[in-house]
Amino acid sequence: LPICVEAEQVEETNCYCTEEAEEKIKKLIEPYPAKGIHFLDSGNYHYVTKFWMEKLTKPFALVLFDQHTDMQEAAFFGLLSCGSWVRAALEQNELLEAVCVVGPPQKSIEEVFKNSKEEPWIDKVCFVSQEELEVRRQTAYDRFLKENSIPVYLSIDKDILREEDASANWDQGKTSLEELLALVKNCFEKQTIAGVDICGENAKKEGNWEASEVEKNNKTNLILLETIGQWMKEQEVNR
């Protein structure tokens, strides 16, 4: 049965997460395992993925479907943020051995390599750009799935999707829901999935909130939940 963890009362969490807020969120999700499908709300809270991954006790890889790299350097006194959490996880989680990010524009990927080329974790990272997805050239992803031999944690930000399939509060990609599901299915067929989370709701903005946006996201969420949930059940049965 679905479980709703209420975190609205936790302050200092929107985009940036203070250490005090981090402790409170971790306490809220403490009773629950990483294995499952976790909905995180808007991309402003994508850093919660880092907390779920910290529950894993064996070496693992992260596959991230996202319009952004989420590998910025931490700003504002080193606070964890929705734009820096992947970098923070690579720096702090010794069990995270590989990361494959699918969806960012090529220019964003180039910025990561330019700004992080000396970082010890950079060789753990591979990318498939938005431009490569548009022409169905996902060589790095296919190679990752072929060579990776450890469990995978899957994280999906719906901002990778075109506007027909989702309404996010950040700039969006051009991938269709059907194309995203094909990529996720490929991962399930070739990897052991340690857990899944989904974010990308359209954070409520005054004067910019339509029922059609909520309905669109709810429809996509239901498809993701039912489809991925079925694949998780099948994987458990076939283990």
Question: What are the functions of these language-model segments?
Answer:
Residues 1-40, 44-61, 84, 94, ...:
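Catalytic cores of soluble, metal-dependent hydrolases
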Residues 60-91:
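Adenosine ribonucleotide-centric catalytic and binding domains
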